[in-house]
Structure formats: structure tokens, C-alpha cells
């Protein structure tokens, strides 16, 4: 039963090119990225955390609307951002902002990441996910999507090619890899992202930068799978940590 909210708030118009499609809809990470950017534009502050619910697929090549409303302004702020299409809310996010640039991250121990050159070029199936035309992936470790392995983990260097705002690109990176559950499967399944929470650290990666993504399915049942991911820059510095809920549509 579709219970998406009708009469969404007015906002700026946006039409996403079909090349950013993943399966039948616009990639969820791109949607989250636009919500992050809308919150930053409204507040003039730095997004530090986001929780987004993806309520319906966003159709490419069809006009959508992005709107943002402040719930709190100040040094610590909170912004509600929505993307709507066909008169209903398709995605909603609550974005925590801080009115200063992100400071250096202090970790208990330095984290070493393998060089980009260690990665093996891996191409997503462009007929199913045209966003592959914008995505360069260098896979690391033994696991591959639909490889029938024993560990539900995917690790890779990822680079996004495309003229995207930095926060929009970051959203795409948060959702760039297939579901890690695919590493232990041999057949594909429809597992769209329905929720994504991320904590953002350090400066947003520059356009076209390589980002290390280590993603693992922490648990799954017959209806959902939960993936945790860590994103790092080439120097090992933390970019973001994310958790997303994927809905298994075969039930």
C-alpha cells in the first residue's frame, strides 16, 4: 500500500539524467547527495550526519523537486530535506549541520589503506545499472558480487566520473557498491536502499577522487539486509561511516 505523503513542500526543480539510474530508478545515493546539498545550501553550514528514508523510486528524466526546511539554526543545526515527484514525497532526510568546517579526525591508531594500484578493475553490468558509466571500481580482496563466497563483504577503490557537486558525489560514493550480500550469492536479487544513515568526517572528497570503500552485511533476514560501510581517502583519513537498510523485494 502506497502511503507516501501528498502535497509536498515546494522546492527547486531537478531532473536526473537516465545515466544515473541503478536498476529501475535513480541511484539512492545520488538522491541522498542532493538532500545533503540542499541542507547545506539552506543552512550555509557543514553537514555532519544524515538519516534518509527512501520512500519511492525517483524516475530519471522526469522532473522532481528538492526542498529544505530548517528545524534548528545556530552552531548546531538541523534541516529536513525532501525530494518529491508526481506530487508525493519520494525521499526525506534529516541533516545535522555544524556552522564550521570539519576538523581533523582523531583515531586511536592510524589506518593504512592499500594503494589504488592494488585494485583490480571491475565493471558493474551497464544494462542493469547505467550509473556504471560514471563509476570506476578497483576491487580489493577475494570477494566479488555474485561470487558465491563465504564473507558478505565488498571492498574497493571507487571513483565517480561526472560533474557533480561534492556533497552529491559523496552521496553516490556512500551507495556505490552493490549489496554486500551479493558476495555470498550466485544470483542477483532486488535489494533497493530504503534507509541510509551516514556520519561525515573531514573534508568532502574532491571531484573524481579515489575513495576506499569497505562494506559488509552485518545482518539480514527474509525482508531486509543491513550494510555497514567505511569510506577513506587515499591517505587513509576517514571520509565517512555509513549504515544502510536494503529491502529484499522478492517477498
Q: PLM ranges: what are they?
A:
Residues 1-251:
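Terminal targeting signals and extreme-terminal segments of soluble enzymes
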Amino acid at each position: 500500500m502506497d502511503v507516501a505523503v501528498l502535497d509536498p513542500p515546494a522546492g527547486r526543480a531537478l531532473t536526473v539524467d537516465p545515466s544515473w539510474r541503478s536498476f529501475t530508478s535513480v541511484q539512492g545515493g545520488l538522491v541522498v547527495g542532493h538532500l545533503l546539498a540542499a541542507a547545506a545550501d539552506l543552512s550555509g553550514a557543514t553537514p555532519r550526519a544524515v538519516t534518509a528514508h527512501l520512500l519511492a523510486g525517483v524516475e530519471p528524466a522526469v522532473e522532481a523537486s528538492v526542498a529544505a526546511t530548517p528545524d534548528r539554526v545556530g552552531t548546531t543545526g538541523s534541516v529536513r530535506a525532501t525530494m518529491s515527484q508526481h506530487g508525493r514525497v519520494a525521499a526525506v532526510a534529516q541533516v545535522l549541520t555544524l556552522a564550521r568546517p570539519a576538523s581533523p579526525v582523531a583515531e586511536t591508531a592510524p589506518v593504512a589503506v592499500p594503494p589504488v594500484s592494488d585494485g583490480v578493475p571491475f565493471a558493474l553490468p551497464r544494462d542493469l545499472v547505467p550509473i556504471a558509466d560514471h563509476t570506476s571500481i578497483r576491487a580489493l580482496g577475494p570477494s566479488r558480487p555474485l561470487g558465491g563466497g563465504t564473507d558478505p563483504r565488498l571492498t574497493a577503490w571507487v571513483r565517480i566520473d561526472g560533474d557533480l557537486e561534492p556533497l552529491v558525489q559523496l552521496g553516490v560514493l556512500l551507495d556505490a557498491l552493490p549489496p554486500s550480500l551479493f558476495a555470498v550469492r550466485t544470483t542477483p536479487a532486488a535489494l533497493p536502499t530504503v534507509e541510509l544513515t551516514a556520519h561525515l568526517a573531514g573534508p568532502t572528497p574532491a571531484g573524481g577522487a579515489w575513495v576506499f570503500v569497505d562494506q559488509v552485511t552485518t545482518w539480514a533476514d527474509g525482508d531486509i539486509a543491513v550494510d555497514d560501510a567505511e569510506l577513506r581517502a587515499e591517505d587513509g583519513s576517514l571520509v565517512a561511516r555509513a549504515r544502510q537498510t536494503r529491502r529484499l523485494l522478492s517477498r
